[in-house]
């Protein structure tokens, strides 16, 4: 079902080359490297039957990529990477370069092993940002991502090292805040795996359109302290 869902959209759109990112992690959709390899093998076989060339990037799915979870918050991360902002999420930048590099190699634009550097050059010299702006203009123009009227931090209850993030519960938290139905709603992460955490410091900030959604999200966070595992 997953293979049909993913590939049918690509085939219907008329794609000839497809690069797919497969995040692997205990709370990701794909939990082991073996499962990722099996999925990519089956998907490759189906894709080849339709004349579709594929490549797979197996990535770390132990934690969310970037800081924002929710349409506008994720868009802010993307824009920060494209314009080269000093505080742009480095993990999102690296993931984007890996995938873009794979696209360049699969399409024959770059020799194998050189796609990453070609993608990095296009990002660093502004060509990627210029192309993104052109794509937006072709679809009606650039728009500033909306901001939610209500925000509230959720703080760590103890000090220590962040050792685990439950991706499924993080996703649930963002949905309770209103994402993705409310484009500005969601959460912003303030910590990454391996970070030192101080009790009382914010782990996430919840963004919501309505007081009820904000309350639902914060109540869920309070009832699920294992969203973030912190070891002393």
Question: What does each model-found stretch correspond to?
Answer:
Residues 1-232:
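Well-ordered secondary-structure scaffolds
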């Amino acid at each position: 079902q997953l293979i049909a869902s993913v590939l049918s959209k690509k085939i219907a759109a008329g794609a000839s080359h497809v690069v797919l990112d497969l995040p692997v992690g205990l709370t990701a959709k794909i939990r082991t490297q073996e499962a990722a390899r099996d999925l990519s093998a089956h998907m490759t076989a189906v894709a080849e039957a339709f004349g579709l060339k594929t490549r797979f990037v197996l990535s770390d799915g132990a934690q969310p990529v970037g800081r924002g979870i929710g349409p506008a918050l994720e868009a802010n991360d993307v824009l920060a990477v494209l314009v080269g902002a000093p505080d742009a999420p480095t993990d999102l930048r690296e993931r984007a370069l890996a995938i873009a590099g794979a696209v360049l190699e699969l399409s024959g634009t770059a020799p194998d092993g050189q796609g990453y550097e070609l993608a990095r050059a296009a990002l660093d010299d502004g060509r990627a940002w210029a192309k993104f702006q052109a794509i937006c203009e072709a679809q009606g123009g650039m728009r500033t991502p909306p901001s939610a009227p209500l925000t509230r931090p959720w703080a760590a209850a103890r000090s220590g090292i962040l050792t685990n993030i439950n991706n499924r519960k993080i996703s649930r938290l963002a949905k309770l805040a209103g994402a993705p139905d409310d484009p500005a709603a969601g959460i912003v992460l303030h910590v990454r795996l391996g970070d030192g955490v101080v009790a009382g410091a914010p782990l996430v900030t919840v963004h919501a359109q309505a007081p009820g959604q904000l309350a639902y999200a914060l109540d869920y966070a309070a009832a699920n302290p294992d969203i973030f595992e912190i070891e002393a």
